[in-house]
Swiss-Prot record:
Tissue: Expressed by the venom gland.
Coiled coil region boundaries: none
Function: Acts as a voltage-gated potassium channel inhibitor.
Keyword terms of this UniProt record: Disulfide bond, Ion channel impairing toxin, Potassium channel impairing toxin, Secreted, Signal, Toxin, Voltage-gated potassium channel impairing toxin
Name of the protein in its database record: Kappa-scoloptoxin(15)-Ssd3a
Signal peptide: 1-23
A cellular component annotation (GO) from this entry: extracellular region
PTM note: Contains 2 disulfide bonds.
Location in or out of the cell: Secreted
Species classification: Eukaryota, Metazoa, Ecdysozoa, Arthropoda, Myriapoda
Taxonomic superkingdom: Eukaryota
């Protein structure tokens, strides 16, 4: 019984490992000249255009800053 539990745990870890590796989140900043503190929606569009070819579904999070946007997006 104990061997089966260890095997199942090993199998679950093995199956989830490729997804964790392939979904690396990258953080980059881009300048935003139109507004001193841009809205999140403006940052999301700017990040999608700059890093993912317009694909907003790959943008995980954005954080507006002083004339900049911090972009968190998935590589794959």
């Amino acid at each position: 019984m104990e061997g089966k539990i260890i095997f199942i745990c090993f199998l679950v870890v093995l199956l989830t490992l490729p997804e964790l590796i392939s979904s690396e989140v990258i953080r980059k900043e881009i300048p935003y000249k139109k507004r001193k503190f841009p809205y999140k929606s403006e940052c999301r569009k700017a990040c999608a255009t700059a890093f993912t070819g317009g694909d907003e579904s790959r943008i995980k999070d954005v954080k507006p800053g002083f004339f900049k946007c911090s972009c968190y997006y998935s590589s794959g």
